Amino acid sequence: MKVIKTAPLIPSEIKVLEKEGNRVKISLAPFEFGYAVTLAHPIRRLLLLSSVGYAPIGLKIEGVHHEFDSLRGVTEDVSLFIMNLKNIRFIAKALVGQDSSLENQSVVVDYSFKGSMELRARDLNSDHIEIVNPEMPLATINEDAQLNFSLIIYKGMGYVPSETTRELMPEGYMPLDGSFTPIKKVVYEIENVLVEGDPNYEKIIFDIETDGQIDPYKAFLSAVKVMSKQLGVFGERPIANTEYSGDYAQRDDAKDLSAKIESMNLSARCFNCLDKIGIKYVGELVLMSEEELKGVKNMGKKSYDEIAEKLNDLGYPVGTELSPEQRESLKKRLEKLEDKGGND
């Protein structure tokens, strides 16, 4: 008998269809029609963005001062050595199982190799480090040569450019880009499934592959947990107390947008670039589109990236879409600040 529902069906089945090495296929069902893709896409994105891995972000080589140096007695130059190093996937044993909410989790490891040898990733295994792709080549050391180097390995997620890791480096270390994500591939398919003879239900099949730093099924569960926490905040806060008032200036973070750009601690180059076109307040940057910001005279890539990172830290990524009411309210607030000649 047909019924008119007042609540969606809750999925009750999760099955591991295949598991081989670092790859797993997982099935979740049943979902109401249209629900499967609604949930599958953000889970896929979170797997790619929030999965935690390990990467070297600092390198110190004895006798080397920058990445364009040569390595005495080593076939590869420093640039190629770094490229090979980035292809090696590490597990920092001391950091496994530590609370991921803790920031700047790292280990430092020292290596010394002497004499003729084909140095491979497996040679970096130690009491502190496990290599998951041991056959990757690293360097060719000639007879009577010695290679001494140290690595700083961090636990993290996503991709972190060397411009950011530079701030974490002790003296003498070269900063490296950090590619932390352990996810090599994640795709999903949506299939129809019968529920009590009704074919209008759906099933999600995830196909997940990692690089070996993390078990793919554990990575999936972790992504779902992140998603649950992200959405859970809406259930924890009283909606009545955060209802939109129609005046953007009433938001708690409106003060951030009325702050002068000096508060962003920009480099002199960035500050001068904005100052020359009359940008005084953070809110003026938030109102600019990505194209407008990139089109500012003398706005190079490094300056743009620096501003974008600062805005992202404030919770307003470049190109943030504000409602017409929010834009109008913010513009009025900035006009008042201009009239007063400073923050109110």
Curated annotation (Swiss-Prot):
The keyword Mitochondrion does not apply. One of its GO terms (cellular component) is cytoplasm. The keyword Cytoplasm does not apply. Its EC number is 2.7.7.6. Residues 1-238 are annotated as: Alpha N-terminal domain (alpha-NTD). Transmembrane segments: none annotated. SMART domains: RPOLD (SM00662). Residues 253-344 are annotated as: Alpha C-terminal domain (alpha-CTD). Keywords: DNA-directed RNA polymerase, Nucleotidyltransferase, Transcription, Transferase. It catalyses: RNA(n) + a ribonucleoside 5'-triphosphate = RNA(n+1) + diphosphate. Coiled coil: none annotated. GO terms for molecular function: DNA binding; DNA-directed RNA polymerase activity; protein dimerization activity. Gene3D superfamilies: 5' to 3' exonuclease, C-terminal subdomain (1.10.150.20), DNA-directed RNA polymerase, insert domain (2.170.120.12), RNA polymerase, RBP11-like subunit (3.30.1360.10). Pfam families: RNA_pol_A_bac, RNA_pol_A_CTD, RNA_pol_L. InterPro entries: DNA-dir_RNA_pol_insert (IPR011262), DNA-dir_RNA_pol_RpoA/D/Rpb3 (IPR011263), DNA-dir_RpoA (IPR011773), RBP11-like (IPR036603), RNAP_asu_C (IPR011260), RNApol_insert_sf (IPR036643). One of its GO terms (biological process) is DNA-templated transcription. It is an enzyme of class 2 (transferase). The N-terminal domain is essential for RNAP assembly and basal transcription, whereas the C-terminal domain is involved in interaction with transcriptional regulators and with upstream promoter elements. Homodimer. The RNAP catalytic core consists of 2 alpha, 1 beta, 1 beta' and 1 omega subunit. When a sigma factor is associated with the core the holoenzyme is formed, which can initiate transcription. DNA-dependent RNA polymerase catalyzes the transcription of DNA into RNA using the four ribonucleoside triphosphates as substrates. Belongs to the RNA polymerase alpha chain family. NCBIfam families: PRK05182.2-3, rpoA. This is DNA-directed RNA polymerase subunit alpha. It comes from Helicobacter pylori (strain HPAG1).
